[in-house]
Amino acid sequence: MGAKHIGFIMDGNGRWAVAHGMPRQEGYAHGLVALYKVAKRCSERGVEAVSVYALSTENLNRPQGELDSIFKVVEKFNLTYDGEYKISYMGDFNSLDDKLAYSIEQVEEKTRDNKGMWLNIAFNYGAKADILHAAKVAYDHGEFLDDTFEKHLSSSHLPPLDLIVRSGGEMRLSNFMLYEAAYAELMFLDKLWPDMDEGDVDKILDDFDKRVRKFGK
């Protein structure tokens, strides 16, 4: 059975920009172009959900100019998106600018009844914080068991995570969907995120289809 839910750690946007003689912050707009290509091909190949790591809570320590560029790209995407995907976000939005937080709310509402693939965006997100929040809610409701605990995670509306792909050459999960990754396959690519395209998706999915998943057995 093919992958139904893939997580992408979109690493390498800043390095790509520098390698092409641009300021680091310009890499994020090019990264969005790559995301459109990757998501489109995933949808064509029958993937039901794509989760992408757009901004970690730790990334908030980056220079303000770089953060402003990320916020601008995300806000523009939210305000202009008119495709078929169902857009969802997970993360802490309380510390975000009101206008950016509102754009997140708007795009989720606008696409709620769409029939396409889920495009789930982790933004100002950290898996450890998400797990702790889910544990607290589950405990408060007296239902701290696996099958009930999971419904309090930010990803509870999505299929189980099958595969995590990280671009950019690093080999770590960086606090991305740690609970959901328990039995997920992992793939690490040297290619920088803005260079990702449809052909890479085909290679990723073809590789996944050859793997034998044991789910801890």
Predicted features, each with a name:
Residues 1-217:
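Flexible, compositionally biased loop and terminal segments
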